[in-house]
Amino acid sequence: MKKIAFLFLVFWFVSCSTNSDNIESPQNKINNVEIIFTTTAPKTDEIQITYYDIAAGDNVSSARQFIYDNNGSPLPLKLVFNDCKYRFLDGEAFRNNFSDAALKVQILVNGELLVERTSKGSNSRFATLNISFRILK
């Protein structure tokens, strides 16, 4: 009987918590999300980016071309979502041609790298990157 009473007290003590311990709850946290795409394709490259815009309630799809510097090196392509209040981002990016050049995405939330993925295409497959992830934990 003493063991049962002791276990009951332990469970009761552990289950009690206050909201004052969690000052910045995930529901109230605002995140700055940065999605950075890079390519190893020489001279020219274009990717198709699609994602669901929760605020607009619609899918967004656009082709984006990489810009190259004077040395022919590709510059990173960035998507920035400041003050993002949503829990997730759902989308993908793909190269709309057959190339074996690598396509890479890095997803940063408040400056912290959360996701890094790389994809290489072939002469029969597009390089495709899934950019779906949870922003809040």
Task: Tell me what each language-model feature is.
Residues 53-103:
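Mature extracytoplasmic domains of secretory-pathway proteins
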Residues 13-35:
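Bacterial Sec-dependent N-terminal signal peptides
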Residues 28-40, 84-93:
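Noncatalytic modules at the cell exterior or secretory-pathway interfaces
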Residues 115-137:
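C-terminal partner/receptor-binding element of secreted or periplasmic proteins
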Residues 48-50, 104-108:
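Beta-strand signatures of extracellular beta-sandwich domains
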Residues 33-70, 77, 129-131, 137:
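Extracellular, modular beta-sheet/disulfide-rich ectodomains of secreted and cell-surface proteins
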Residues 1-18:
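Sec-dependent bacterial lipoprotein signal peptides
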